[in-house]
From Swiss-Prot:
Residues 220-240 have a biased composition (Basic residues). Residues 1006-1027 are annotated as: Leucine-zipper. Keywords: Cell membrane, Cytoplasm, Membrane, Mitochondrion, Nucleus, Phosphoprotein, Repressor, Transcription, Transcription regulation. Pfam families: TSC22. One of its GO terms (cellular component) is mitochondrion. Residues 257-271, 742-764 have a biased composition (Polar residues). GO terms for molecular function: identical protein binding; transcription coactivator activity. It is a peripheral membrane protein. Signal peptide: none annotated. It comes from Homo sapiens. This is TSC22 domain family protein 1. The modification Phosphoserine is found at residue 263. Residues 1-98 are annotated as: Required for interaction with TGFBR1 and promotion of TGF-beta signaling. Transcriptional repressor. Acts on the C-type natriuretic peptide (CNP) promoter. Acts to promote CASP3-mediated apoptosis. Positively regulates TGF-beta signaling by interacting with SMAD7 which inhibits binding of SMAD7 to TGFBR1, preventing recruitment of SMURF ubiquitin ligases to TGFBR1 and inhibiting SMURF-mediated ubiquitination and degradation of TGFBR1. Contributes to enhancement of TGF-beta signaling by binding to and modulating the transcription activator activity of SMAD4.
Length: 1073
């Protein structure tokens, strides 16, 4: 437990980093879908690597379109820094791998299992396993970002995490981060990608030096640079991409498959086209790193590559984690673990390459953003577009981080300050994360260490979520977030960032705003990673956490000068939050997220508070540096904001689904300054619209794939990311949906892109939806969901006939949470397709309409509702597209809510479980119920909403929707009901175990406190007696007179003394009882 504190710190830091990383990773992933996970890594690592790459890559712009976003997100402006980064990155990478090798492995294994769901594990296992282990560690660090995802596993993870994580993890994490970044850079450079492992290693030393000596600054820079670099890359887009792709995937897009295999890059690869380079490099290096880290450990096999997705995941994780900081390495690992978990689901879901990617993203996020990575990966999987989404996912993952973050928080809490706030309090974790971020910011030490800083970014990205996962930054990212962010988590943010950054570059100032937001995102995710970045927004919780973190981080960073990084971290966090953040996961949304975060805040006050602050900070002080970032990121933010925001938000949302909504809300508000994104914000709305566009944009989607895709994907991921949190994965799964997701991203992108350009717009549009959907989805099945989602998606997609598809989906959902998600996604996809028009439209049209408003409302509402709404909203779009899906989506949404509620984590988990069941039920309504359980009132409302899926604010619409849902449900209800019951039982058990765990921890804390008080009391009594003995009669008489007179000294003291013990006792008994 004690370790946990450190772990926590590490985790938080990791999360932060994770989240940030996530965010970045997300970016990267965005850059390269395939890179998704790698991307995530890239984001952080690549950020470093990428940046350098970016510079190098710039020339090859064409290929790099996606990367540009990453670059953009990173920081278009700083190519030079990137170069520096490069060195750094490489050094880092190398270092990372090294440190990670042993540590990470451990982490992976420990956490992975717990975190990862069996399915996830299997999916991610090949790569995941290594990663998983990492992830687990990461989770631990992150706050059991992943754990959260797997409700049951969470506990284990927590435990394992506490144990596993410990300081070492953190250290390794940090190292990993360093390595990771280093590696990433090389990857980014591209040459290394294939070699990633070796080159990185060799570089390691050099880079390390840089890192150590320069790293710090570099890192800081790094972050900035990365962001900037990314920006550049992004802006250059192509070059970056190419470089990245090349690096990562030597092959480049073509290589993608291979690359994918090769290293995380592989995942990246798939995504590669999107932003493989970045991603790849990221993944590549990161993968390498991961691999190195992990591979060195066991990871090699993971090779992250092994499962492309997984690989990526690993990478991502590493990124988030690695980035996080060397220490974080362990953390990272933890993050990774988380990621893995998430990823696993993603992996599971993604198992397809796409999935894998998804997974990667998640991982990123989870890492805290590892998770995010996974998400991104997932996105990737779906296709390039998916890849992009993947990137987003990454962000998301931050979210998982975020989600994870939530849980993580609990865990973290116990570890670091268990008694401070209920374990269950997400805030706690985030706060921790925040602290961490602060630390991070402060960490500057660490951050300074390149790793740290990057991590921060990563974290932001992550917390995810990651995570953001992570948590704060990565918190879970998720570190936890990531994270989750931030988890939870980052990628999305990153992606968004990338895009946004691109945009940013284009519209830096606006971007600035956006960035700020975004940064917030990242920050959030980072912290989360996940995380705060909400990504990692990984926190995801992490993100959210991250967000919080971010805020703090922001502060810190701002104060420290880390600011920039912090910003990034923040961004990451934000992303993450969106992520990681989360979750992310949540942070990501940062941009939007920021707003989101605010929103987030709403949903997750804790986070959100942090987030908002972050937001403010971003805008305010950070702006300066943050602005830098901000600018860079801003764009991202902006972009993010738009779609991403959503995503980001989602990330955070993912962190908290709410975030998403929030994001959206925020978005809607235009909040983020992002306003540009505003639209983004609108995103939600826009998304909706876009979503609507989706249908229109179906093409967009396809288009997306190419460049757009990346972006969209990125965004989708973001969206996904946002979702991620819990569902990040799901999201990702959806991402698999990705197409849809991508679309969503697109949608999101559009805002950003729109800013950037029409195409993106179109792309963006759809993505937005998807994103949202994803979000919904994400939440719903955090890990599983994703997988399911993916599966589902296919079906859904296949099923296009929404109605049927929907039901199937519903059923599918029953079978798998994912499915629900899937369906959602699928709905998305479908919706994207015709569904939107068709089914949705018919039944849903109104709903959509409602949705939209609801969206806003929901958003406002709350996060939960907002989320719901958002989800729904988007779903609405989707919903529109598909009634059922909508419903499902909503459920997802609900799920999100739940996640958001987090309810907390537990609720979320339970909900997830339920969700799994419920979703199946189409029972969105049920899901909602489940959600409601988790969410409680909101949830319920949501549920209703869900039911009313159509109406996001379903509450109002409920009647309408419900019927819809109900009707649809009925067909699948028989089995669904049973499945749901089972799920509910499982969820209850899970909750029970979690509660027991939490209670035990609290009791322990209280016992210790009581002990301390008793000791103190006895000591005071002894002192009193001694004083009495020593005192002269005159003095005593005086004293007595004073007492009688009412002099407080003695009297008060004794009373005070007595009271404390009494209180403790009562406390003890209370808790004990």
């Amino acid at each position: 437990m004690h370790q946990p504190p450190e772990s926590t710190a590490a985790a938080a830091a990791a999360a932060d980093i994770s989240a940030r990383k996530m965010a970045h990773p997300a970016m990267f992933p965005r850059r390269g879908s395939g890179s998704g996970s790698a991307s995530a890594l890239n984001a952080a690592g690549t950020g470093v690597g990428s940046n350098a790459t970016s510079s190098e890559d710039f020339p090859p712009p064409s290929l790099l379109q996606p990367p540009p976003p990453a670059a953009s997100s990173t920081s278009g402006p700083q190519p030079p820094p990137p170069q520096s980064l490069n060195l750094l990155s490489q050094a880092q990478l190398q270092a990372q791998p090294l440190a990670p090798g042993g540590t990470q492995m451990k982490k992976k294994s420990g956490f992975q299992i717990t975190s990862v769901t069996p399915a996830q594990i299997s999916a991610s296992i090949s790569s995941n396993n290594s990663i998983a282990e990492d992830t687990e560690s990461y989770d631990d660090l992150d706050e059991s970002h992943t754990e959260d995802l797997s409700s049951s596993e969470i506990l284990d993870v927590s435990l394992s995490r506490a144990t596993d994580l410990g300081e070492p993890e953190r250290s390794s994490s940090e190292e990993t981060l360093n390595n990771f970044q280093e590696a990433e850079t090389p990857g980014a450079v591209s040459p290394n990608q294939p070699h990633l492992p070796q080159p990185h290693l060799p570089h390691l030393p050099q880079q390390n030096v840089v890192i150590n000596g320069n790293a710090h600054p570099h890192h800081l820079h790094h972050h900035h640079q990365i962001h900037h670099g990314h920006h550049l890359q992004h802006g250059h887009h192509h070059p970056s991409h190419v470089a990245v792709a090349s690096a990562s995937i030597t092959g480049g897009p073509p290589s993608s498959p291979v690359s994918r295999k090769l290293s995380t890059t592989g995942s990246s690869d798939s995504i590669t086209p999107v932003a493989p380079t970045s991603a790849v490099s990221s993944s590549g290096s990161p993968a390498s790193v991961m691999t190195n880290m992990r591979a060195p450990s066991t990871t090699g096999g993971i090779g992250i590559n092994s499962v492309t997705g997984t690989s990526t995941v690993n990478n991502v994780n590493i990124t988030a984690v690695g980035s996080f900081n060397p220490n974080v390495t362990s953390s990272m690992l933890g993050n990774v673990n988380i990621s893995t978990s998430n990823i696993p689901s993603a992996a599971g879901v993604s198992v397809g390459p796409g999935v894998t990617s998804g997974v990667n993203v998640n991982i990123l996020s989870g890492m805290g953003n590892g998770t995010i990575s996974s998400s991104a990966a997932v996105s990737s999987v779906p296709n390039a577009a998916a890849g992009m989404t993947g990137g987003s996912v990454s962000s998301q993952q931050q979210q998982p981080t975020v989600n994870t973050s939530r849980f993580r928080v609990v865990k973290l809490d116990s570890s670091s300050e268990p008694f401070k706030k209920g374990r269950w309090t997400c805030t706690e974790f985030y706060e921790k994360e925040n602290a961490v971020p602060a630390t991070e910011g402060v960490l500057i030490n660490k951050v300074v260490e390149t790793v740290k800083q990057n991590p921060i970014e990563v974290t932001s990205e992550r917390e995810s979520t990651s995570g953001s996962s992570v948590s704060s930054s990565v918190s879970t990212l998720s570190h936890y977030t990531e994270s989750v962010g931030s988890g939870e988590m980052g990628a999305p943010t990153v992606v968004v960032q990338q895009q946004q950054q691109q945009q940013q570059q284009q519209q830096q100032q606006p971007a600035l705003q956006g960035v700020t937001l975004q940064q917030m995102d990242f920050g959030s995710t980072g912290p989360q990673s996940i995380p705060a970045v909400s990504i990692p927004q990984s926190i995801s919780q992490s993100q959210i956490s991250q967000v919080q973190l971010q805020s703090q981080e922001l502060s810190y960073q701002q104060k420290q000068g880390l600011q920039p990084v912090p910003l990034q971290a923040t961004m990451s966090a934000a992303t993450g939050i969106q992520p990681s953040p989360v979750n992310v996961v949540g942070v990501t949304s940062a941009l939007g997220q920021q707003p989101s975060i605010s929103s987030l805040a709403q949903p997750q006050l804790p986070y959100s508070q942090a987030a908002p602050p972050v937001q403010t900070p971003l805008p305010g002080a950070p702006p300066p540096q943050q602005l830098q970032y901000g600018q860079q990121q801003p764009m991202v933010s902006t972009q993010m904001a738009p779609g991403h925001v959503k995503s980001v938000t989602q990330n955070p949302a993912s962190e908290y689904v709410q975030q998403q909504p929030i994001l959206q809300t925020a978005m809607s508000s235009g909040q983020p300054s992002s306003a540009g994104v505003g639209a983004g914000t609108t995103v939600i709305p826009v998304a909706q619209p876009q979503g609507i566009q989706l249908p229109v944009q179906p093409t967009a989607v396809p288009a997306q794939p190419a460049g757009a895709s990346v972006q969209p994907v990125g965004q989708a991921p973001a969206a996904v990311s946002a979702v991620p949190t819990g569902s990040q994965i799901a999201n990702i799964g959806q991402q698999a949906n990705i197409p849809t997701a991508v679309q969503q991203p697109s949608t999101q992108v559009p805002p950003s892109v729109i800013q950037q350009g029409a195409p993106p717009s179109s792309q963006v549009v759809p993505p937005a939806q998807t994103g949202i959907i994803h979000q919904g989805v994400q939440t719903s099945a955090p890990s599983l969901p994703q997988q399911l989602v993916i599966a589902s998606q296919s079906s859904l997609l296949t099923v296009p006939p929404q109605p049927q598809g929907v039901e199937p989906v519903a059923q599918g959902i029953v079978s798998q949470q994912l499915p629900a998600v899937s369906s959602l996604p699928s709905a998305s996809s479908i919706s994207v397709t015709s569904q939107v028009s068709s089914t949705g439209p018919s039944g849903m049209p109104s709903a959509p309409t409602n949705l939209v408003p609801p969206q806003n409302i929901a958003q406002t509402p709350a996060t939960q509702n907002g989320n719901l709404v958002q989800s729904v909203s988007q779903p609405p779009l989707i919903a529109t597209n598909t009634n059922l899906p909508l419903a499902q989506q909503i459920p997802l949404s609900s799920t999100q809510f739940s996640a958001q509620s987090l309810a907390q984590a537990i609720g979320s988990q339970i909900e997830d479980a339920r969700r799994a069941a419920e979703p199946s039920l189409v029972g969105l309504p049920q899901t909602i119920s489940g959600d409601s359980g988790g969410m409680s009132a909101v949830s319920d409302g949501s549920s209703s909403s869900l039911a009313a899926s159509a109406s996001l604010f379903p509450l109002k619409v409920l009647p309408l929707t419900t019927p819809l849902v109900d009707g649809e449900d009925e067909s699948s209800s028989g089995a669904s009901v049973v499945a749901i019951d089972n799920k509910i039982e499982q969820a209850m058990d899970l909750v029970k175990s979690h509660l027991m765990y939490a209670v035990r921890e609290e009791v322990e804390v209280l016992k210790e406190q009581i002990k301390e008080l008793i000791e103190k009391n006895s000591q005071l009594e002894q002192e009193n007696n001694l004083l009495k003995t020593l005192a002269s009669p005159e003095q005593l008489a005086q004293f007595q007179a004073q007492l009688q007179t009412g002099s407080p000294p003695a009297t008060t003291q004794p009373q005070g003394t007595t009271q404390p013990p009494a209180q403790p006792a009562s406390q003890g008994s209370g808790p004990t009882a």
